[in-house]
Amino acid sequence: AAETVVSGAELSLTANSGGEKTPPHAPGLLRRSKRCSCSSLMDKECVYFCHLDIIWVNTPGHIAPYGLGGPFRSKRSLKELFPTKATEHRNRCQCANQKDKKCWNFCQAGKELSSQDTMQKGWDNHKKGKDCSKLGKKCISQQLGNGKK
């Protein structure tokens, strides 16, 4: 007897919260189920939270998502391709279901945490003496002196 392997994407026929079936004009068109859409696929924590049916492979260097380039890719709006100043402070992700409080909290908290992390890293680098661009020769000599200790 032949065995059939079915991926998570093939099992998921809908991604919308209404539970509607695939439209009749597109039979066999499969969509991955997503809790939300991340602003950046480089944000691994967000991708792990949002994409429900991805198999995660633990490689020696890092944990990598397997199967992100699935059989279906939805069209993206021009707003995503050409961001304006109004979208600079966007959320970490956008929830598929606006009533999903856990998702909404994750996306909102993620935005605040990422900006706090950026500010903290900048302050840490300043305290370590790595940012001497505005302080001049005195800063550079202090940095060289700290490196000799």
From Swiss-Prot:
Region Endothelin-like: start-end pairs: 93-107
Location (main, coarse): secreted
InterPro entries linked: Endothelin, Endothelin_toxin_CS, Endothln-like_toxin
Residues of the site described as Cleavage: W56, V57
Record's GO cellular component terms: extracellular space
GO molecular function: endothelin A receptor binding; endothelin B receptor binding; hormone activity
Residue ranges of the propeptide: 1-33, 57-149
Disulfide bonds listed in the record: C36-C50, C38-C46
Annotated stretches, region: Disordered: 6-26
UniProt entry tagged with the keyword Disulfide bond: yes
Record key words, sorted: Cleavage on pair of basic residues, Disulfide bond, Secreted, Vasoactive, Vasoconstrictor
Subcellular location: Secreted
Source taxon at top rank: Eukaryota
Pfam families per the UniProt record, alphabetical: Endothelin
Gene Ontology annotations of biological process type: endothelin receptor signaling pathway; intracellular calcium ion homeostasis; positive regulation of protein localization to nucleus; regulation of systemic arterial blood pressure by endothelin; regulation of vasoconstriction; vein smooth muscle contraction
Family: Belongs to the endothelin/sarafotoxin family.
Function of the molecule: Endothelins are endothelium-derived vasoconstrictor peptides. Probable ligand for G-protein coupled receptors EDNRA and EDNRB which activates PTK2B, BCAR1, BCAR3 and, GTPases RAP1 and RHOA cascade in glomerular mesangial cells. Also binds the DEAR/FBXW7-AS1 receptor. Promotes mesenteric arterial wall remodeling via activation of ROCK signaling and subsequent colocalization of NFATC3 with F-actin filaments. NFATC3 then translocates to the nucleus where it subsequently promotes the transcription of the smooth muscle hypertrophy and differentiation marker ACTA2.
Protein name: Endothelin-1
